[in-house]
Amino acid sequence: MRVIPLASESLGVRSLATFVEAGGLRILIDPGVALGPKRYGLPPAEVELKTLQQMRKKLQGYARKADIVTISHYHYDHHTPFFEGLYESSSEDYAREIYAGKILFIKHPTENINFSQRKRAWAFLKNAEAIAKKIEYADGRSFDLGGVTIEFSPAVPHGSEGSKLGFVVMVLIDDGSKRVIHASDIQLLNRRSVKWIIEKNPDLLITGGPPTYLGPRATGSWETGVKNLNEIILETNAEVILDHHIVRDKRYPEFFDELEKRPKTFAGYLKVEDRPLEAYRRELHKIEKGEGAEVPFRL
């Protein structure tokens, strides 16, 4: 099995897009990239927009290779919509390239879903149904694909129990020699997802941390995230790739320091420098204006 992290906050955009080659199958997980439209009251800096285009180009390249596409939920950093979006670098052509002729395993569009995501799922399916090879609603189901098993969790909260952001599905890929779980946007904040991960006992866990950058709206999420991920590490001894929401917080290295086994970011797994652009948006705007500011990465 070969696991290739594609795009994430440590690579400069909002995403957790991943490509997996297993048993002759080529699987693209959560094919979306986006930028936060506002952070510190500021729009994306120029370097963020440039990086978004680079990540879109990379995502489309891997989409052309994929046989299977999985979608954990309908936020635009996890799937590419069929409209032209500046901060999603999206278009109908990009979407068609990703989904046409592919087998799609997707979060159920009408069950365990909030109003916003239900609307997005409807818009997605209105376009995708005509071009996909096959579409399966994946929640809680398992698929045997000739030596490779792809298993999906039941719908679990997007974050803490009772979250207004809706639900997501996690995916396990097992080729008989390695078990990989991609646990998108669980934020390590609900017991259902933690129990499912421990029960499935992965060799590698790819997940997003808590949204500690939200400040008072995320009170207690740091402690809960550390506790839950440490439990997963101790129970499974999985290698962990941790990225996404937590890397929007400049303090994310301190979060990593509190874990029983230090995870890698997407950038770290790829052996390149972390470039958490959104976390340093204030500094990036100052640099672009010629004002004095420093960031802990190369521009």
UniProtKB/Swiss-Prot annotation:
Q: Which GO molecular function entries does the Swiss-Prot or TrEMBL record give?
A: hydrolase activity
Q: What are the transmembrane regions?
A: none
Among InterPro entries, the record links this protein to:
Metallo-B-lactamas, RibonucZ/Hydroxyglut_hydro, UPF0173_UPF0282_UlaG_hydrolase, UPF0282_hydrls
Give the family from UniProt: Belongs to the UPF0282 family.
**Protein's name according to its UniProt entry:** UPF0282 protein TK1681
Q: Which organism is it from?
A: Thermococcus kodakarensis (strain ATCC BAA-918 / JCM 12380 / KOD1) (Pyrococcus kodakaraensis (strain KOD1))
